[in-house]
Amino acid sequence: DDDGKTFTKTYYSEGGIVEFVELIDKNANRQPLIPTVIYCDGLDAASNVTVEVAMQYNAGYQEHIFSYVNNINTIEGGTHVAGFRRSITRVFKSYGEKQGMFDKAKVTIEGDDFREGISAIISVKVPEPQFEGQTKTKLGNSEVMGVVDTTLSRVLEAYLEENPRDAKTIIQKVILAAQARAAAKRARDMVQRKSVLVGGGLPGKLADCQSKDASQSELFLVEGDSAGGTAKQGRNREFQAVL
């Protein structure tokens, strides 16, 4: 201190990063989707890299990931975060496909869908960390990605097999995220397409179709508002447009 005396401060949390995940969700009023925080830890003998991960799905729509290397907050992420994302995408995708849940949903699943509503803490201990990025807060050690991926995947696979109800809840959330993303894209494409058509000088009374494939689309020309209304009601919106 200012007087030259040595003092120490000890910070201790009995629950560790599991309690950390619970705290950040509680402080943000995020409702847990599953009752348990999924936790894993491990030491890779070859690289001497230690991994700790705690993750929890909630009812929200955002991804909240906090990553650390040797207790340094890596705000730009890095290979440890990449390994985490690769693991949850691969493991949950494999489980959903094996259970046939994605086939029933008839929607394309992307990596972001698996991370919607997830809160996670990733903490690794690396003997010789290599930091990158503008502020040197991005981990660059390539070997860490595989260590995190392998360590987390082993625990996730066992968790899903042992907790089928939680697994189903998570996969259903993933599917809902994919469906919402696809619906938003369709709505955005329709608005942009109509803007282009109207801006190009086409009549405002064009009832466009949803298909973008001109070879599979049909355009019906009708005279009068009455006939136009009848045609719109009887058409197939997927590939039939009415003018």
Regions found by a protein language model. Name each.
Residues D1-L243:
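GHKL-family ATPase ATP-binding module
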